[in-house]
């Protein structure tokens, strides 16, 4: 079998990712990337929260698989930048075909960002609402402690907190998986943006391929939009992490107070029992 000759990539830092994607394609082993789910963000979140703690999150589908050295977003950006390189230099065998392939790759990046932004926004809204709701008892601590003297109420609090701890864990797992992908995508997009900036200073393609100016401008706009989206996701991820910690602290405080009241009630019952013996 003839060995695959991988072309030199115009961005040296993408050569490895490009070669891996080419080898996977030639071997027919290209992984099926997670597509933009037709389900709503609410459905995805409900599925995430209903799953067991150890199950993979939706975001983890993007992680590197056994035998892979490069992240899927790096490989996508390597393919996109190579396609632009072919078009600007007039060495594509079929411009229309390359443009169609590029559009498919652009759609994949857009879908990843759109889905992740939706998931982060909904997670933040959900955790903020739970945080607001659970802060109320601790803002009226004397009333809350008095209510905790009721055994059934204590049981409801403990059971509810177990569910919230599960929600915190699943949300944090999905967030961490997504942020790993976001960092990979951001790094790859930076490299692509640098390449596009360098090509802007290259006069040859502008004179020989003036029809490619629109393609260049569109891709430059894509890169700028992706960069802003990745940065926005990192900001949202940091905020989500902060409110998850706050929610966890409130749950821990409620559990602590429920435990304290429970021990107090056991002592009280024991004392009453002892007195009844005399």
Enumerate the predicted regions with their spans.
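Eukaryotic extended alpha-helical scaffolding/oligomerization regions
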Residues: 2-261
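Long, low-complexity intrinsically disordered regions
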Residues: 256-278
């Amino acid at each position: 079998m003839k060995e695959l000759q991988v072309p030199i990539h115009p961005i040296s830092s993408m050569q490895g990712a490009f070669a891996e994607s080419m080898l996977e394609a030639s071997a027919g082993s290209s992984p099926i990337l997670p597509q933009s789910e037709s389900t709503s963000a609410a459905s995805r979140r409900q599925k995430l929260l209903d799953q067991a703690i150890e199950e993979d999150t939706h975001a983890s589908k993007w992680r590197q698989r056994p035998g892979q050295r490069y992240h899927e977003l790096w490989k996508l950006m390597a393919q996109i930048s190579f396609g632009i390189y072919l078009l600007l230099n007039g060495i594509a065998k079929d411009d229309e075909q390359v443009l169609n392939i590029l559009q498919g790759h652009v759609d994949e990046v857009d879908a990843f960002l759109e889905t992740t932004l939706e998931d982060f926004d909904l997670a933040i809204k959900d955790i903020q609402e739970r945080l607001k709701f659970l802060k109320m008892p601790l803002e009226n601590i004397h009333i809350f402690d008095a209510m905790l003297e009721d055994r059934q109420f204590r049981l409801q609090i403990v059971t509810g907190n177990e569910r919230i701890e599960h929600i915190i864990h699943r949300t944090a797992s999905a967030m961490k998986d997504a942020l790993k992908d976001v960092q990979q995508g951001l790094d790859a997009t930076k490299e692509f943006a640098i390449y596009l900036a360098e090509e802007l200073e290259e006069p040859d393609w502008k004179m020989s391929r003036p029809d490619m100016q629109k393609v260049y401008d569109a891709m430059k706009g894509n890169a700028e939009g992706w960069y802003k989206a990745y940065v926005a996701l990192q900001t949202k991820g940091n905020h989500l992490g902060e409110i998850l910690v706050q929610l966890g602290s409130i749950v821990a405080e409620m559990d602590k107070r429920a435990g304290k009241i429970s021990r107090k009630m056991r002592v009280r019952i024991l004392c009453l029992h002892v007195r009844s013996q005399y």
